[in-house]
Regions:
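Hydrophobic alpha-helical segments and helix pairs
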Residues: 92-142
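A hydrophobic, small-residue-rich beta->alpha segment in the mid-to-C-terminal subdomain
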Residues: 220-263
Length: 283
């Protein structure tokens, strides 16, 4: 068996696109490598806009148009201009979970400083999944997902006995680093709510490109509850996953991006920002 790695920079007038493609033999990934979308065939790519390290370093303003995001995928997570809420992309709609606890369909004329999406096509499923905590869920998936070093898009549907969520209010310049912003996050606990966990798992090699490990957002079935997940508890959930066999990164061409220093963003900062967990299972 052989694995090939493709690296390329593709320059267009407003965006630099860094593509990393990992092509595996069919015996390694038996599921289909491409999915049909609107009569077209789309690669199983995780398409990312900017870098987590840039976001952590306070590059919050402007970014890619949300319409461009939907052209790249129908499923994923991210944030909005000036960190104005948590982004959930599900079934081709972008939802904005605001710091006042409301959820709305996002204005597609808006922008995102950071997001990652894919065209979700099921490559496998895990039924009757039960988790007492978010850490319990992550540990189970580490054992059950087929490949350690591929990114995964995952959706878990069911009734959640409890879910702890957060969002942050829109920021104003001069921007603070994200590790300071999350100290002022707003959190909620909800009980006995039906909905979907929308998540990504990125392998360790992705480092400051994205969150290594698991990154979960949540949206209730009635689209009234949503946010970044700090904790959850559920029984008999249905998980579907999509293996992403390539990664495409659209890099901003802004002064803020050009000047940020990735070495100043520590793993401890990323833990505080994106791997934060509720201290106990929600009750």
């Amino acid at each position: 068996m052989s694995t090939t790695l493709r690296l390329a920079f593709l320059w267009v007038p407003t965006i630099a696109c860094f593509a990393i493609g990992c092509t595996l033999s069919p015996t390694q990934v038996p599921a289909r490598a491409k999915h049909e979308r609107n009569g077209h065939t789309a690669d199983d790519a995780l398409v990312q806009f900017s870098l987590l390290a840039a976001l952590a370093a306070d590059d919050y303003a402007g970014g890619a148009p949300l319409r461009d995001l939907l052209a790249a995928g129908d499923f994923g997570v991210g944030t909005f201009d000036r960190l104005d809420g948590e982004m959930i992309v599900l079934d081709g709609t972008i939802y904005q979970a605001l710091a006042d606890g409301t959820v709305r369909a996002a204005d597609l004329d808006g922008t995102t400083p950071f997001a990652a999406v894919t065209f979700f096509g099921e490559d496998g499923r895990i039924e009757n999944l039960t988790a007492a905590t978010l850490d319990d869920l992550d540990a189970q998936l580490d054992r059950k997902l087929p490949h350690r070093n591929l990114p995964y898009a995952m959706r878990i549907s069911g009734e959640f006995a409890a879910v702890t969520l957060r969002s942050v209010p829109a920021q104003s310049p001069p921007f603070e680093p994200l590790v300071e912003v999350v100290k002022h996050q707003v959190t909620w606990q909800h009980h006995n709510v039906r909905g979907t966990l929308v998540g990504l798992r990125c392998p360790d090699w992705m480092g400051t490109i994205n969150v290594s490990g698991y990154h979960w957002h949540f949206l209730s079935d009635d689209h009234t509850i949503g946010g970044h997940v700090l904790g959850c508890e559920f029984q008999n959930g249905s998980l579907r996953y999509d293996e992403c066999t390539s990664v495409v990164i659209h890099l901003p061409q802004s002064t803020e991006f050009d000047e940020f220093d990735a070495s100043e963003v520590t793993d401890e900062d990323i833990d505080q920002i994106e791997r934060q967990r509720a201290q106990t299972s929600p009750k």
